[in-house]
């Protein structure tokens, strides 16, 4: 679902994508780790394993790169308890000026996955979708310039 976004980012001379993941929800009767289907709106699911959604980018230290960085830093405003911006040390060692934006409950922000209740999973899904929508809008605006 984010392939077009990644393609658009690849067209920017001030940025390259290091890694990304859409974010996946696993639960009984849905154990495909590549699942991209929305969570069911109703059901008897008690707990959900969430595998984080994120995008890691390396940005050029240029005017365009700095402007894009400023916009990325604003993304957590969607929901700061579930959306973080920062620098992942293991990326920075190989790619200075690399940054990550991730959707993960704040209490688990240093983990790749976590188990949450169904209602929290629904909230995470909404935050993830808003994050990618806003990022796509941002990229589209830059693309038009």
Identify the meaning behind each predicted range:
Residues 1-145:
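Structured alpha/beta or helical-core interaction and ligand-binding surfaces enriched in interleaved
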């Amino acid at each position: 679902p984010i392939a077009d976004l990644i393609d658009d980012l690849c067209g920017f001379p001030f940025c390259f994508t290091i890694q990304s993941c859409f974010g996946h929800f696993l639960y009984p009767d849905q154990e495909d780790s590549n699942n991209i289907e929305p969570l069911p709106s109703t059901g008897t699911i008690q707990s959900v394993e969430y595998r984080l959604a994120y995008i890691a980018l390396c940005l050029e230290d240029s005017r365009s790169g700095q402007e894009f960085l400023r916009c990325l830093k604003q993304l957590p405003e969607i929901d700061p308890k579930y959306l973080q911006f920062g620098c992942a040390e293991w990326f920075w060692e190989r790619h200075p000026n690399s940054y990550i934006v991730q959707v993960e409950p704040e209490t688990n922000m240093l983990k790749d996955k976590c188990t949450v209740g169904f209602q929290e999973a629904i909230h995470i899904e909404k935050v993830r979708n808003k994050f990618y929508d806003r990022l796509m809008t941002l990229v589209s605006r830059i693309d038009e310039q």
